[in-house]
Structures are given as C-alpha cells and as structure tokens.
UniProtKB/Swiss-Prot annotation:
Stated name of the protein: Adrenodoxin, mitochondrial
Cofactor(s) named in the record: [2Fe-2S] cluster
Organism the protein comes from: Gallus gallus
Pfam families xrefs: Fer2
Main localization (coarse): mitochondrion
A single cellular component GO annotation: mitochondrion
Amino acid sequence: CSAVAVRTLRPLSLSARAACSSEDKITVHFINRDGDKLTAKGKPGDSLLDVVVENNLDIDGFGACEGTLACSTCHLIFEDHIFEKLDAITDEEMDMLDLAYGLTETSRLGCQICLKKSMDNMTVRVPEAVADARQSVDLSKNS
C-alpha cells in the first residue's frame, strides 16, 4: 500500500516543484555583439554561462571551456550598480580576465557569476569581440 502511495505522490511533488521553480526564475537580458537584446531565465545559483547554454542563446563562442576558468569567452560587462553587488573576484578569474578582449572596470566572467534574486531583470553586455585565452596559451607553447 505504501508503494502505491509513493507512486501517486511523486508526480504531484514533481509538478509542485516545477511550479515553484518557474516562479523563482530570474530574468537576464544579454546585449550580444550585434547589439541585439537576448532575454533568458535562470534559477538562483545558476551561473550566467548556465543561463546562456540552457536557453540556447546565440552568442558565438561563449563559454568555450565550459566554465573551467581556462578561457575568457564568457566575458561580460556589467552595469555599475550590479557590478558593485557581485561576489569578490578570485585571482584565477582575474588572470583569465587579463586576457579578455575589451576589458572594462566592470568586466567579469559569466561562468563565475551566480544568479541571485536581486539580479532579476539585469542587463549585461557581451564585448564586441572575443579572445579565447586557451589560444593565447597554445600559441605561447609553440614559440
């Protein structure tokens, strides 16, 4: 009898979880290299790289290393008021950002920024071009 009860409750709990998660979604606006606005949603705790990948956003070359801090292709530029609220940058992220194209004072790597509810409806800008830090490393190994 208890096995039957578990089977009938399981779908209810899954649908309840789905309803909660859709309400908890955070909207992020990306301005791509062409100046087009791409809007996507993610869950609290998702990285901005996760949001781009899971929503199949068309941002060429974004996240080439899949979030392993081995490139700078997920480089994003934040508005000042959002940048000031981001968690502290690590030395590893700073090293990768040093190799990023179009570095600004409000640049961060999308793979290192996790969504919080306070970020709902934020807009981030993708730089005009991308530099893949892995290629720079590969080139220096060959010389």
